[in-house]
Structure formats: structure tokens, C-alpha cells
Amino acid sequence: VVLRISHALNGNAFAYNQDFTINGVTNYFTRLQYYLSGISIHHDGGQITPLNNVYVLASGHIKSYYLGSYTFNQVESISFDVGVDQAANAGNTVNYPSHHPLGPQSPPMDWGWPSGYFFVVSDGFTDSNNDGTPNAPFSLQALGNQMLTSIDPISVNPTSSNDTIYVDLIANADKFLHGLDLDAIGVDHSSSPSNLAMCNNALNMSVFEAGFINTSIENEPSRNFVHVDYTLPYAPTFNYHFNSTNQINLDIYGVDGKHIIHHSNLPHEGSYFPLKEFSSGIYILSLSNGKDKITKKYTVTQ
């Protein structure tokens, strides 16, 4: 079973640095991540199967999330919690491998312990002077067990291919921020009422709904992108997406042309964090799937 989440802004396909309007104000995201836990699949005439110990770390630029192998014939609906259940939130990232959603992440998805995981992270810029251009940074990162928000079962119309069931949801990312004065909030990494409202908006504002956004035809390069996340300026993370499902080759060069890193057979969408430590400077990132190629200049600041 694969959960496919099409993230949206004002009904259009999600993109970082893309303007959207909420509360009558123009904003854009530079980072959007959140956890899903307590997932249950309703199937085959009303049976309910909880997906125990299955966690999703969703990101605005990633669509597909593998939930596991099950003997379902017909999936009827899906329910889940936004955030991490209390038992897991009392754990620690060191208890999981790096590829696990609850394992160490870059940028971090936790505040250490006992504080626990960030349930929802919304970073970006908002228009503070009403000129239509987002200029003031905001960063809401919600933590605390009280942030856990249960989403009622969502009826779905899954598709099947090669013994895989695809469950399609739309996540209206802008609705996470409904009713929040982002300029006044600024930076808030806590269990505050603002962060609680952001998490509760997942239910109250129906952030999640059944369906998908048909952004473009397969292999169309116009939907390919890479976004550099500078949350850690000394160790940027690369969020990327290619519309084709071909595997990706990644290369990093110095501005002098020296080849520093090569990584092959990466998935067509994801986040890449170089394990190598880089000195301050300018670097060139290259991503290619054999047909389409993206190059991006970025900086490291130690």
C-alpha cells in the first residue's frame, strides 16, 4: 500500500517559494514537514486494520509514502493522527536508523528529549507591510503530546497497479496556517497556542481530503525542481522532485570544477543531506535522471 499525498497551495500544486494567500496575506513556504502516525486502513466491507508502528514523515515536495504489504482487496477509507503518538514521542531518534521517519533528520525534526519530536513544521516568509511581497520570516515548529490531532476517516477511491494499492490524498498546506498572524508570531518552536492551532487546523480546516492534483504528464520536465533548505546554513539539505520515476544521479562540484560527491540510484523525489563536511564557500549541485538535468548553485556558511 502506498499513500500518495499531493500537497497544494490555494488549490494549486505545492512549491517552495511559491506565493499563496491565507488570512488575506501573501506568504510562501521554505519548509513544510509533518508526521503521521496511528494510521488505520478501512477495507473489504468495513474491516479496520491498524498499521502498527508505521510512521510517515511527510514533506511538501514528496508525494509517495510506502505503508507496507497487506492482504487488502479493496481500501475504503484511511484515518490517522497528525503528529507522533505518545509512546514514540517518549523515545529518541537514536533508537532508529537514519532512513526511518523517527530516526535522525536534517534539518532536525526533534527538539531533543524530553521535549520530543516536532509534529508539524511550517517555515517561510509572510508579507508584513501589505505590499504583496512576503518579507518577514516565520517559523512554527510544534512539539508536545497535546499537539496530536486525530483525522476522521477519509473515504478514498484507490487505484491498483502491479499488486500495489495507491491511496490518494490532497493536503491543502495553506490551511495549516488559517487564523494565524504569522508576522506577529515570528519564530515559535514550542507547545504554544499558536502551534496547537496550526496542528488542530489539520482537522478543523480539513487540510486533508481525498483526491489528487494532476500537475503534469509523465516525464514533463517543467515540474522538476530542487530547493535548497538553509535551516542549517553549514549543512544545507536538498529537497528535490523529478516527474519521471527514473532513478537520480547526484553530483556536487566546487566552483573550481572539482568533483566532490557522486551518489547514484536515488529515488525520483526526496531529500538529500551530504554526510561530508564542507568548508564555507559556493558549490554546484547537479541532479540527472538520464534525460532531464537540474543544476543549482548553493552556499555553505560555517
Ranges and model annotations:
Residues 71-78, 269, 279-284:
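A glycine-anchored, Pro-Gly-centered beta-turn/N-cap motif
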